[in-house]
């Protein structure tokens, strides 16, 4: 199954009625998203060996919250959605959508917000980014979108991505369309922007018990059935791993067909669990999965592979 974005005026009455049964897409709910993430990161930093880095990530998330409201985005995506729908492509496809200068404006605003909080190497990194040319910044963004992580140092990548993510989340939040599920391929990628997930979440509330993958760029969530590999869609050789017990709020779902894994977070076990923060705070589980020979099928926006990884 893939998920395709259908423009509002192209939906029939039956599609409008059924669209709400199992929502295939949950567009970004930006209100308090970054504040909630920052709070969760700070909470998880207590008694965590990665505490300093989690607090660093919390600073970036808080800056995203501030910049989000200081620099709103106005854009009409109606035409873009129609074109993408006709082509069967994500409307905000990272590989083809031209980037507006707005994202670099967001980056500079993030740097200004973060500067007073940074010192040492981190301060040097953002000052270096502040001095970079427009083309240099565009080249780094293109490299990240192409998964050419050796071309962007792992200390710069989180700042670049934070601005790109904010820009894409603002655009995704403006999409004036609905979504429906259609048979197809590549459901392992975000149907809105084509990026990869950071983790998956079994939710509570109106989507109780449903699993949604959370995009590491535009913050959209999309439905993928449980007990099926989110990477290759096979279901015969899945295994579930945790560091605690069977009731753990965080597990890794591994697939022996494709050799990858993705974390599953369970809101019913911990209502405060958060897709990015809890994934980052559970790197010990990633280390275990690597020891078992599995490759991660996702990337956390605060932790990019470095050169040679």
Swiss-Prot record:
GO MF, one example: ferric iron binding
Pfam families referenced in this protein's UniProt entry, alphabetically: FdhE_C (PF24860), FdhE_central (PF24859), FdhE_N (PF04216)
GO terms for biological process, alphabetical: protein maturation
Annotated GO CC locations: cytosol
Keywords (A to Z) from UniProt: Cytoplasm
Subcellular location: Cytoplasm
Disulfide pairings: none
Task of the protein: Necessary for formate dehydrogenase activity.
NCBIfam families with a match to the protein in the record: FdhE, PRK03564.1
Similarity annotation: Belongs to the FdhE family.
HAMAP family hit by this protein: FdeH (MF_00611)
UniProt name for this protein: Protein FdhE
Organism: Escherichia coli (strain SMS-3-5 / SECEC)
Lineage: Bacteria, Pseudomonadati, Pseudomonadota, Gammaproteobacteria, Enterobacterales
